[in-house]
Amino acid sequence: MLKLSPASMTVTGLRQTMTSPTVPPSSNTPAGNLIITSSSSNSGSNSGSNMSSGNMTSSNLTNLSPSHPAGLNALASPTSPSALLLAHQQHLLQQHQQHQQQQQQQQQAAALQLAAVHPPAHHLHKTTSRLSNFSVASLLADTRPRTPPNQAADGPQNLTSSAATSPISQASSTPPPPPASAAAQVPANTFHPAAVAHHAHLLQAAHAAAAAHAQHQAMAAQLRQQQQQADARANSPPASTSSTPSSTPLGSALGSQGNVASTPAKNERHSPLGSHTDSELEYDEEMLQDHEADHDEEEDSIVDIEDMNADDSPRSTPDGLDGSGKSLESPHGPPPGSHMQSTILSPAALASGHVPIRPTPFSALAAAAVAWTGMGGGVPWPGTRQMPPFGPPGMFPGAGFGGDANEPPRIKCNLRKHKPNRKPRTPFTTQQLLSLEKKFREKQYLSIAERAEFSSSLRLTETQVKIWFQNRRAKAKRLQEAEIEKIKMAALGRGAPGAQWAMAGYFHPSLMHLG
């Protein structure tokens, strides 16, 4: 039995089939009062209850008089509970569709406004990381619609989906009110609380589904906007042919500064060394230590040895000029020493690609110790070819690397042109190598006086002797470690009882002659 009270409504029982006859409103029934008759399963008697006009008073229910037949047609038998539920579901569905359309229009307007305010991402950003520049919160920040939502036919029409057809309670989830135009077109129907209570279990799920659908729509609009921006950037011609072009003035400035800063470091590897031997007056000890530590670059240099018996060669001067006042000329013809400083960093000289950039005191003598392995060991150095040396041949006495004016003449070393990243290398004669090896077996470290005397006897510079001893000690260490590794592997393979002693490193002077 369905009991309807003026203050509240409780559902105590429903018939299995909602086929109760409907009572049309008569002329003696006051407007706003509704009489509902239902059959009871216990007594079988019909009981009617008159409701006051305060419970179901709305703009539509007050028009149920015989003089207003349009109200009856719009509500389609309002006295039936099934008709009430159906009408309520249709009304909530229309409100939900309008709400979704408003959200979509607001999101599209916010996305267009955000794209107009913020410029597209820089070219240095990767394509996969462009999603981090936008977010749903930024898209939903401005919720003011630009155009009135008057397109009611664009909403989702799938009535089988629970998210679209489930009614939403106006008490638990309050959607934003529609604009005035939409409110004027759709009448605001107020339904009986029984219809709302009948579907209370679906309210929370419908609200969650609607929120998820709105978020999905926002993400789809965002992805479409980003795809359009990516297509526009892909169709535009690139500003430069570099892998990471700079599209902003700040990026261009940073790129130019990086190029200028990296140019001396790149070209310093293949700078030719003429007779500029007093470089210690210009370059500090830090550059010398950096070149000594860079042993990987020491093995890519070749230097020619000039005639050691020519005693009448002109003396070198600190500015890189010989006695006749002529500067050393490379095969490409660099300018004289007076104009060298201004020509080094000029754009034309840098564009040519073959102007020497700042020769270092260590570049010509960096790999002096590894040269004898190709000559005395019987293994030729790969990539070497005979080319005529350039520059005035002869010996140069006087102030060299760390020497004074009282030292005897030394060997003049000139660069042979190979490839841009190749550094000069000093090939020693067989007699010099034998003397160096003999001295190394006697003493691995030379004092300053011993090094000066020994270099004078071999007609080498002190720097050449010093670097040769450094590389020879490194080679002896590598050979010693390789020999120890062989002993360890042999002991472990045999499983000898003394294998634990083979694991400990040891040093024996007899290993120094290997090589």
UniProtKB/Swiss-Prot annotation:
Gene Ontology cellular component list: nucleus
Keyword flag Flavoprotein: no
Pfam families: Homeodomain
SMART domains hit by this protein: HOX
Keyword terms of this UniProt record: Developmental protein, DNA-binding, Homeobox, Nucleus
Classification via Gene3D superfamilies: Homeodomain-like
Entries under CDD domains matching the protein: homeodomain (cd00086)
DNA-binding positions: 421-480
Tissue/organ expression: Dorsal lateral ectoderm, developing central and peripheral nervous systems and the somatic mesoderm. Expressed in dorsal and lateral muscle preclusters and mesodermal fat body precursors.
Region feature Disordered, mapped onto this chain: 1-76, 90-113, 142-185, 214-279, 307-342
Biased segments, Polar residues type: 7-16, 254-265
Subcellular location per the Swiss-Prot or TrEMBL entry: Nucleus
Bias-annotated ranges (Low complexity): 17-65, 160-173, 214-249
Gene Ontology terms: biological process: brain development; central nervous system development; dorsal/ventral pattern formation; dorsal/ventral pattern formation, imaginal disc; ectoderm development; embryonic morphogenesis; glial cell development; imaginal disc-derived male genitalia development
An annotated Gene Ontology molecular function: sequence-specific DNA binding
Function according to Swiss-Prot or TrEMBL: Plays a key role in the specification of proneural and promuscular cluster formation. Required for the specification of dorsal and lateral muscle progenitor cells. Regulates development of peripheral nervous system derived from lateral neuroblasts.
Family: Belongs to the Msh homeobox family.
Name this polypeptide is given: Muscle segmentation homeobox
Species: Drosophila melanogaster
High-level lineage: Eukaryota, Metazoa, Ecdysozoa, Arthropoda, Hexapoda
Gene behind this protein: Dr
